[in-house]
């Protein structure tokens, strides 16, 4: 069965002032109704490379942002601008390929994983859809990579993604260490609980084409990430929104920053000391928005739950311990955890 892609719908809708009904959100979700207008949220910005920030200071800044916000931006992160530019260039070129070429790596029908080119990710409540196409594939560790889900075109796609994966590892270690120390653990403990050297780096490219009615649609609906941590690179088109104090706010990107989301697994492992961020994405009438999140995930068979030394009689476990793959299944199918 042929799947209708949002990119194709966008092209057909260019001269219209309407979108298919399945993309129109309920009034309680519509950005025009629910966004706090005229206010842009300044989420914390943390300088990872500043000589003024001691390790102790960085730990404090990252831990506070993760407790209070669940989202922050990092600058001077050590990933070369060139590596990010190449990642973005090849991703954009993939989505500009003829449709039949993209379909070569489409998610197979009935496939239980998320890897591949696609449009639908999770159970759609009320038949409502997000205004986005995507491509998922693992970029690290090499033992977990399935190149069948990587594009052959553009020719430099593999090189750019592998270079970015290697460059990312220093930032990943720094974040896990700070988050561990920030709740009184040894610096290696949260990464070890997330899989250690088997930690999965799952890249997703989000492609949000122009939408004639951005006031009615959403790119990705409100959610928290399943991952431990998400490290995201956006293009220049704004669109990320965060839910804070019962309102939806636009988040302003800092040029050359990485956007860090605390995901469900860090909230679970920290037994609620850190908060996964509730967020969504809006779309643009005239411009294509793209983003490149990397979800840092435990291996599927790994048991994840609150770290035992954080559980006491006064602070009992707030979450179940279960295999990560079971957590993912429940989340994608909107089942209770």
Swiss-Prot record:
Reactions accelerated catalytically: a (2R,3R)-dihydroflavonol + 2-oxoglutarate + O2 = a flavonol + succinate + CO2 + H2O; a (2S)-flavan-4-one + 2-oxoglutarate + O2 = a (2R,3R)-dihydroflavonol + succinate + CO2
Taking every annotated instance into account, which residue ranges of this chain make up the domain Fe2OG dioxygenase?
A: 198-298
What EC number(s) would the UniProt record show? 1.14.11.9, 1.14.20.6
Kindly tell me the pathway this chain contributes to: Secondary metabolite biosynthesis; flavonoid biosynthesis
Q: Which GO terms describe its molecular function?
A: flavanone 3-dioxygenase activity; flavonol synthase activity; L-ascorbic acid binding; metal ion binding
The entry marks the following residues as binding Fe cation, namely 223, 225, 279
Question: What cofactor is this protein dependent on?
Answer: L-ascorbate; Fe cation
Please give the SUPFAM superfamilies that the UniProt record associates with this protein.
Clavaminate synthase-like
Q: What class of enzyme is it?
A: oxidoreductase
- How many cofactors are bound and how? Binds 1 ascorbate molecule per subunit. Binds 1 Fe cation per subunit.
Q: Which UniProt keywords apply?
A: Dioxygenase, Flavonoid biosynthesis, Iron, Metal-binding, Oxidoreductase, Vitamin C
Q: Which domain of life is it from?
A: Eukaryota
Q: Name the family.
A: Belongs to the iron/ascorbate-dependent oxidoreductase family.
Q: What does this protein do?
A: Catalyzes the formation of flavonols from dihydroflavonols. Acts on (2S)-naringenin and (+)-trans-dihydrokaempferol to produce kaempferol and on (2R)-naringenin to produce (-)-trans-dihydrokaempferol.
This protein is called what? Flavonol synthase/flavanone 3-hydroxylase
Question: What is the protein's species of origin?
Answer: Petroselinum crispum (Parsley)
């Amino acid at each position: 069965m042929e799947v209708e892609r949002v990119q194709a719908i966008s092209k057909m809708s260019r001269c219209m002032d309407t979108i298919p009904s399945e993309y129109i959100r309920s009034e309680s979700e519509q950005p025009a109704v629910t966004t706090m207008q005229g206010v842009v949220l300044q989420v914390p910005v943390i300088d990872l490379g500043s000589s003024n920030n001691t390790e102790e200071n960085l730990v404090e800044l990252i831990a506070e942002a993760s407790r209070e916000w669940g989202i922050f931006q990092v600058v001077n992160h050590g990933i070369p601008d060139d590596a990010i530019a190449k990642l973005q260039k090849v991703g954009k070129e993939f989505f500009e390929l003829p449709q039949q070429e993209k379909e070569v790596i489409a998610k197979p029908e009935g496939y239980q994983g998320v890897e591949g080119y696609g449009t639908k990710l999770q159970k759609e409540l009320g038949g409502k859809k997000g205004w986005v196409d995507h491509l998922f594939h693992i970029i690290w560790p090499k033992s977990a990579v399935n190149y069948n889900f990587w594009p052959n075109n553009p020719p430099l796609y593999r090189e750019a993604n592998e270079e970015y994966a290697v460059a990312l590892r220093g930032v990943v270690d720094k974040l896990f260490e700070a988050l561990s120390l920030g709740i009184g653990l040894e610096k290696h403990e949260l990464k070890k609980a997330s899989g250690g050297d088997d930690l999965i780096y799952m890249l997703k490219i989000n492609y949000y084409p122009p939408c004639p009615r951005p006031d009615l649609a959403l790119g990705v609906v409100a959610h928290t990430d399943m991952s431990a941590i998400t490290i995201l690179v956006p293009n220049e088109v704004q669109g990320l929104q965060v839910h804070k104090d019962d309102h939806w706010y636009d988040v302003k990107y800092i040029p050359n920053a990485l956007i860090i989301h605390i995901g469900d697994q860090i909230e679970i492992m920290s037994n609620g000391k850190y908060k996964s961020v509730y967020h969504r994405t809006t779309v643009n009438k005239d411009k294509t928005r793209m983003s490149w999140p990397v979800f840092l995930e435990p291996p599927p068979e790994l048991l994840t739950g609150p770290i035992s030394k954080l559980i006491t009689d006064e602070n009992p476990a707030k979450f179940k311990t279960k295999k990560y793959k079971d957590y993912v299944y429940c989340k994608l199918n909107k089942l209770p955890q």
